[in-house]
């Protein structure tokens, strides 16, 4: 069919990252979020569908509000891209919203902000009920120095100290707008809002903050670590289990819905 007849759709989805080998589909056929989603979309579209995501997630990393766009010549009502697609998705993935968007909309390049939450359990014994849902440390954490340390993340900075060796980003300079830490019932929540994030950046930040909270790294040492701009001197990368992509920001004109973070999280 004529490509001029194609429609561009944006969908918001949630997924349990512990069930998949990351977002990106792989040649060896292991289960990934992208592969499962494109298979389900093709069932509704009656044609192959290729997706573009706001931000790829690694194995074990979850999303409550990931955004994807795709093009199709199939004329389907909005609910077909929600309920219809969900009927063909495996457990662990759900489409929350769908919206036809302007043909120039791009899920990745039009995003000007991203939100992440890291959920951390601090307890002598790891709860089996939180396995794959939260990170864990047996160490008792002092939240106040962790908050003071997190304040040093705010602003435009070179975050090379929290950048994975395999990161493909062109620049390590990113802007963090908000870095909040809260604690209740043995769970620590780190909320980060920034324009973009480096590979493993949130997990590396969490690893360093755990060092601060347990007394292995001072607040001043955390601040100095950022200025070092060297991953070699930083604490280890923290586990993926507790990391959630909780939102993506777009210009209002596109009408992309950003759901509230679920109360259970």
Swiss-Prot record:
The lineage of its organism: Bacteria, Pseudomonadati, Pseudomonadota, Betaproteobacteria, Neisseriales. It comes from Neisseria meningitidis serogroup A / serotype 4A (strain DSM 15465 / Z2491). The keyword Isomerase applies. GO terms for molecular function: RNA binding; tRNA pseudouridine(38-40) synthase activity. Formation of pseudouridine at positions 38, 39 and 40 in the anticodon stem and loop of transfer RNAs. Substrate binds at residue 116. Homodimer. Belongs to the tRNA pseudouridine synthase TruA family. Its EC number is 5.4.99.12. HAMAP family: TruA. It catalyses: uridine(38/39/40) in tRNA = pseudouridine(38/39/40) in tRNA. This is tRNA pseudouridine synthase A. The keyword tRNA processing applies.
């Amino acid at each position: 069919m004529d490509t001029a007849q194609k429609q561009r759709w944006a969908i918001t989805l949630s997924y349990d990252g512990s069930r998949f080998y990351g977002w990106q589909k792989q040649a060896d056929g292991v289960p990934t979020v992208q592969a499962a989603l494109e298979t389900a979309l093709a069932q509704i579209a009656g044609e192959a569908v290729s997706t573009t995501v706001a931000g790829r997630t690694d194995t074990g990393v979850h999303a409550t509000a990931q955004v994807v766009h795709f093009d199709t010549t199939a004329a389907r009502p909005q609910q077909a891209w929600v309920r219809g697609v969900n009927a063909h998705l495996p457990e662990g993935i759900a489409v929350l919203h769908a919206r036809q968007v302007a043909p120039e909309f791009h899920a990745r390049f039009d995003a000007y902000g991203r939100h992440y939450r890291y959920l951390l359990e601090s307890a002598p014994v790891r709860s089996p009920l939180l396995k794959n849902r939260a990170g864990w440390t047996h160490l008792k954490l002092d939240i106040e120095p962790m908050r003071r340390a997190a304040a040093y993340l705010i602003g435009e900075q070179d975050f090379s100290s929290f950048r994975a060796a395999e990161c493909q980003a062109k620049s390590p300079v990113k802007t963090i707008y908000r870095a909040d830490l809260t604690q209740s019932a043995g769970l620590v929540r780190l909320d980060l809002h920034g324009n973009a994030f480096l590979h493993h950046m949130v997990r590396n930040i969490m690893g360093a903050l755990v060092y601060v909270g347990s007394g292995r790294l001072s607040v001043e040492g955390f601040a100095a670590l950022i200025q070092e701009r060297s991953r070699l001197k930083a604490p280890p990368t923290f586990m993926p289990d507790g990391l959630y992509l909780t939102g993506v920001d777009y210009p209002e004109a596109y009408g992309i819905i950003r759901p509230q973070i679920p109360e259970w999280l």
